[in-house]
Amino acid sequence: VKGRRSRVIHSAMNQNSYQQSLDYLYGLEKFGMIFGLTKVEAILEAIGNPHREIQAIHIGGTNGKGSTAAMMASILQKEGYRVGLYTSPHLTRFTERIKVNGKEVEKEEVATLTEWMKKRIEAAGITPPFTFFDFTTAMALLYFKQRMVDLSILEVGLGGRLDSTNVVDPLLSIITNITRDHEEQLGKSILKIAGEKAGIIKKAVSYTHLRAHETGR
């Protein structure tokens, strides 16, 4: 009975810590969208620059980038690679955003990572505003380093050039179909939008553009 009670108390404490972490993370949404890499780079510096120690595939575009990321992760996993996958937004649970070999990050791990990162960020003198996506991107990269993934697949949140995920120096950049979206942030023309999304293409890095096939009616 004592053992069972202890497990129940421990589970409740973990759930409370996880909820506190979510409250902190979602509280960052009050800062809205802040484009640029300055804050996420500062956060990564404070936590040891984990992105420099993992191999990444970076996927941007307008349509299909999430499904492309998921398919690539599945294929690579079947080939024997240990694969980290970072996508957004989530459908029902925050933990859907960060996976290793198809398994979502545990709630307890989210709580532990959040608290550890907060302490390191505060010690480094980094103060808000930084965004929910800045923090969660850094969290995903740290988690992938800790779990010693062979490859990490990162889906761009919005745009590309100034997106928080663009801190990585990837093995491969992929851009899916490009159409008009988020014109207030990315530009009013398809050319400007494409230019922002193409910002994930790095010098001396392989890239590919996946175009949707048009069918006649």
Could you describe each region identified by the protein language model?
Residues 10-61, 68, 74-79, 86, ...:
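Short functional linear segments
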Residues 1-12:
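Short, basic, low-complexity termini and linkers enriched in Ser/Thr/Gly/Pro
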Residues 174-175:
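Conserved beta-strand/loop subsegment of P-loop NTPase cores
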Residues 37, 41-52, 78-168, 180, ...:
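ATP-dependent carboxylate-amine ligase catalytic core
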Residues 201-210:
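Short loop-to-beta-strand entry elements in the cores of soluble alpha/beta enzymes
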Residues 209-217:
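Single conserved hydrophobic/aromatic residue that forms the stacking wall/gate
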Residues 27, 187, 195:
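Phosphate-coordinating loops and pocket residues in cytosolic domains that bind phosphorylated ligands
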Residues 194-202:
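Membrane-proximal helix-turn-helix segments that form the acceptor-binding/catalytic region
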